[in-house]
Structures are given as C-alpha cells and as structure tokens.
C-alpha cells in the first residue's frame, strides 16, 4: 500500500525496539512510556496511545542511556490494538542515540 510519508524518507530505518518516553500532548498532558518499531539517526517510528497532529512538537527521551530531543510529528496513523503509530523527526538531539548520524 502506498503511504505518502514513505516517499520523503532520506534514510533507511532499522527495525529496533527501544523503550522511550514521550510528552507534550496539548489535549492529554503527561508522560507516556512506549517503544519504537524502527529507527534511524534522525528519527523513529513510535507507538502512542494518543493521536498526534502533524507538525506537533513533543519531548522524546530514551529510558536507558542519555538521548533526548524535541521531535516533530511527521505523520500519525491508526495502529490496530495499539493506538497510533507516529513518525518522528528529531530536531534538537542530545546524548547518544542508537544510530549514529552518517558521516558527511
């Protein structure tokens, strides 16, 4: 099935489950502990119980390690029995992420 968000991806995602915390939902405040499905150096696909709007910003942090970032919601789609799958683009990363940026 064609999905428009896949056309703009500049990096291949790596399937990897990483425990993370996300926060910053305007209508449902609080911190949500969840996991990634796939990752790259500049973003991740994460599952959430909440519906997010495209271009919303949220706080993203790993449970283990020291990585954190403000992230932009690139897309949000319903995910059966889980809630929603969201594509995140890291905007202000700090610390060590599980995938290093490509050398330029």
Explain the meaning of each model-derived region.
Residues 1-104:
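Structured alpha-helical
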